[in-house]
Amino acid sequence: MAKGKQPAAATTYTHWLVKAEPESRIEKGVDVKFSIDDLERVKVSSWEGVRNHQANSYLRDQMKKDHLCLFYASNCKVPGVTGIAKVVKEGYPDHNAWDPKHPYYDPKSDPDKPRWYMVDVEFVSKLPHPVPLSLLQQLSTLSPSPSSSSTLPESLSYLSPTFLSSLSDSTLLRRGRLSVQPCEEGFFEGVREMGERGGWEDWEWKKAAGAKKGVKGKRAKKEVEEVEEEDVDGEKGGEEGEKEAMGRRSKRAKKA
């Protein structure tokens, strides 16, 4: 008798992308901005305020000590990856959800039955060449083959076909609204290498991207930008839902 199919093993991730807002925004009298410079200054910070169930499950169950994270600047003029962080404390209850005065207060969470979790991350490095989201979007349109290198400037010849092929399948480009998301090691290393080496500054990739996109491309870009995908009791649609998401999508710096 033929053996039954074994259930597929759950994917285990060791690399992540976490989003924070680098520009000032006041919520309940608190400036919720948090940039890679802020993390460098405080060295270690809790990653609190996540109010999306999928992202929360990553924080609670899957992000482990020494896992590396791409630090992503969100909701700013040039969104993209600006640095590297490392998990130094695994998931524990986000106590800010119990504080009515806190920007990320949730009346349905309590100490006896925590609803939201956070991890602690440590500053690793600031990338000398921040990697724009729009550049990754443009690179994802290239054919993932050796011949694709002919469309790139010599200064970007270090980008491998494997990395280029990983872009279109990356969570960042498929489910860009998640503020905490897993990424494959190849994607992580490729983006980190870009941030360390640069090479696109003189490439007219923005012009090429604009010529291809049109209305459809602009709509697609909007979909991956830039708000955390909130789903506290389900995501609301329309203007009301957008306002609610806007109120919770940031990362707040700890007081020094």
Where are the model-predicted features located?
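Intrinsically disordered, low-complexity, charge-biased tails
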Residues: 1-5, 213-256
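Aromatic- and Lys/Arg-enriched surface recognition patch
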Residues: 84-178
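GIY-YIG nuclease signature motif recognition
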Residues: 18, 85-86, 184
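Eukaryote-biased feature marking scaffold/signaling PDZ-domain proteins and nuclear chromatin regulators
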Residues: 13, 64, 80-82, 114-116
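Compositionally biased, charged N-terminal/linker segments
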Residues: 1-65, 198-201, 206-210, 216-219, ...
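Mature catalytic domains of secreted/periplasmic carbohydrate-active enzymes
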Residues: 7, 142, 148-161, 165-172, ...
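Short, charged beta-turn/beta-strand-edge "cap" motif at the junction between a beta-strand
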Residues: 72-79
